[in-house]
Curated annotation (Swiss-Prot):
SUPFAM superfamilies: Thioredoxin-like
Bilayer-spanning residue ranges: none
Catalytic activity: a hydroperoxide + [thioredoxin]-dithiol = an alcohol + [thioredoxin]-disulfide + H2O
Organism expressing this protein natively: Escherichia coli (strain K12)
Active site residues of this protein: 46 (cysteine sulfenic acid (-soh) intermediate)
Similarity comment: family membership: Belongs to the peroxiredoxin family. BCP/PrxQ subfamily.
Gene that specifies this protein: bcp
Protein name: Peroxiredoxin Bcp
Note: The active site is a conserved redox-active cysteine residue, the peroxidatic cysteine (C(P)), which makes the nucleophilic attack on the peroxide substrate. The peroxide oxidizes the C(P)-SH to cysteine sulfenic acid (C(P)-SOH), which then reacts with another cysteine residue, the resolving cysteine (C(R)), to form a disulfide bridge. The disulfide is subsequently reduced by an appropriate electron donor to complete the catalytic cycle. In this atypical 2-Cys peroxiredoxin, C(R) is present in the same subunit to form an intramolecular disulfide.
Function field: Thiol-specific peroxidase that catalyzes the reduction of hydrogen peroxide and organic hydroperoxides to water and alcohols, respectively. Plays a role in cell protection against oxidative stress by detoxifying peroxides and as sensor of hydrogen peroxide-mediated signaling events.
InterPro entries reported for this sequence: AhpC/TSA, Peroxiredoxin_AhpC-typ, Peroxiredoxin_BCP/PrxQ, Thioredoxin-like_sf, Thioredoxin_domain
EC number(s) on file: 1.11.1.24
Record GO biological process: cell redox homeostasis; cellular response to oxidative stress; response to oxidative stress
Amino acid sequence: MNPLKAGDIAPKFSLPDQDGEQVNLTDFQGQRVLVYFYPKAMTPGCTVQACGLRDNMDELKKAGVDVLGISTDKPEKLSRFAEKELLNFTLLSDEDHQVCEQFGVWGEKSFMGKTYDGIHRISFLIDADGKIEHVFDDFKTSNHHDVVLNWLKEHA
């Protein structure tokens, strides 16, 4: 696993959202976007992380940042997740983990003694020109939003 770094050009992608509509990274050209990768919708850690972003969306918008969450869940599951948690941002389905691999977040993980391939919880702030401005890879699900907002304030 080799995640992209600040300064790299973000891979262009097109993925279905929670409503089955195609969303392209190029739709956000001229804007900053936080692309956050998370392992699985409707699980405890991922729910805490998503709700933290939801509850701080006004602050993120003030900083000029849109949010896209990416997992390998099917759009139908993402739709249920968004409805259940009243999420106010777009969730994208990368079922074949191609985009995860392009960003370098797909790789070997271990949980309770088992080793498997999956998504590593990493977020990328992409600038208005499509370049990775910052990589967030050191946070807890409960403070992800704080880590992002603090970085945005320090680099305003």
